[in-house]
């Protein structure tokens, strides 16, 4: 390829001016031909010299052109190698982008499913509570209408006839019932207001959970290498503990004879009090050996606190940060709901 194709400036072509014509060469033939023949031979020799100089100049230009061609070929080879490396790097980057997109889609699918399921469950609970509050409100309104009708009927009966004492007692009873109904109505309205506030809080919690899901999705998009980890749910209550307590109670109810028989059997198995003492010594040594790593760990932690108190404070600050508390609340919310519904012990 040439410099014009690559966009490089072409070297200037320098054409040297022809030299002065040489004096005519005098030979015996020119003497025989005379002055006219000598001039003719001189012009021929001058033309030959100019042609030879032009040929030399062309050879020099040819050498320069070949040298420049070699330089351009070398430059082209370097550019081709760099282009191949760039193409390979572009292919690697595209492959990496595809793998990251696959990983992001695989990680986002379960998170989306969990968020949708949680939002659906909360919406269902909110709908049920709204329906219950609406039914309770309708029942109270119907009861209030019935009492109002009874009050009007009793008022008409008292107005058109009846004993004065019975009228007063009936009026007092009706007034007391009316006050009671008004109190019940106010209490029902207060309960409805509290339920509405609770439903609003549930809606805010649902929006907050959706915002947390969106934040996790953004984190997966920005940092695809980093694995978005959802905090694990708290384990159910330990039933083995209850079983151990029951076994302890059963063991405490055994008879004294069984305990003595067990002690006698252990004595016979372990070879008497001396073997039992050796066994206790070995168990004590094992306890000491197990306690030593904990002691070293505590000393190293104390040394770290003495050297750099800011590290422990930063760790504690990260544990009590708003993000950690939000994730903990999001993780423990199903258990709290189970406890509120009476499915877990208080």
Curated annotation (Swiss-Prot):
Residues 101-120 are annotated as: Disordered. Residues 52-206 form a coiled coil. Signal peptide: none annotated. Keywords: Coiled coil, Membrane, Transmembrane, Transmembrane helix. Its main location: membrane. It is a single-pass membrane protein. The keyword Translocase does not apply. It comes from the Eukaryota. The chain crosses the membrane at residues 282-302. One of its GO terms (cellular component) is membrane. InterPro entries: TMEM191B/C. It is found in: Membrane. Belongs to the TMEM191 family. This is Transmembrane protein 191B. It comes from Homo sapiens (Human). The gene is TMEM191B.
């Amino acid at each position: 390829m040439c410099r014009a194709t690559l966009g490089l400036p072409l070297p200037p072509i320098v054409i040297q001016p022809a030299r002065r014509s040489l004096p005519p060469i005098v030979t015996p033939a020119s003497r025989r031909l005379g002055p006219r023949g000598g001039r003719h031979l001189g012009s021929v020799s001058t033309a030959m010299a100019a042609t030879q100089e032009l040929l030399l100049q062309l050879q020099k230009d040819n050498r320069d052109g070949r040298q420049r061609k070699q330089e351009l070929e070398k430059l082209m080879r370097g550019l081709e190698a760099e282009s191949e490396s760039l193409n390979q790097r572009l292919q690697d980057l595209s492959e990496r982008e595809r793998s990251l997109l696959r990983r992001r889609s695989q990680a986002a699918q379960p998170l989306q499913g969990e968020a949708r399921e949680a939002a659906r469950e909360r919406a269902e609970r909110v709908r049920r509570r709204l329906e219950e509050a609406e039914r309770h409100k309708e029942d109270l309104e119907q009861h209030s209408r019935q009492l109002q009708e009874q009050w009007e009927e009793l008022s008409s009966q008292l107005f058109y006839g009846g004993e004065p004492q019975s009228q007063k007692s009936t009026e007092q009873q009706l007034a007391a019932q009316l006050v009671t109904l008004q109190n019940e109505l106010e209490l029902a309205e207060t309960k409805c207001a509290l339920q509405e506030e609770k439903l609003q809080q549930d809606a805010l919690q649902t929006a907050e959970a959706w915002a947390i899901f969106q934040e996790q999705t953004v984190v997966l998009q920005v940092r695809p290498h980093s694995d978005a980890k959802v905090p694990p749910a708290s384990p159910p209550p330990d039933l083995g503990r209850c079983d151990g307590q029951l076994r302890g109670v059963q063991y405490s109810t055994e008879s004294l004879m069984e305990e003595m028989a067990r002690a006698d059997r252990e004595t016979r198995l372990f070879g008497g009090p001396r073997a039992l003492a050796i066994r206790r010594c070995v168990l004590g040594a094992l306890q000491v050996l197990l306690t030593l790593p904990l002691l070293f760990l505590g000393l190293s932690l104390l040394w770290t606190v003495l050297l750099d108190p800011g590290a422990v404070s930063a760790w504690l600050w990260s544990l009590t940060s708003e993000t950690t508390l939000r994730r903990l609340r999001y993780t423990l919310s199903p258990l709290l709901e189970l406890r509120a519904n009476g499915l877990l012990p208080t």
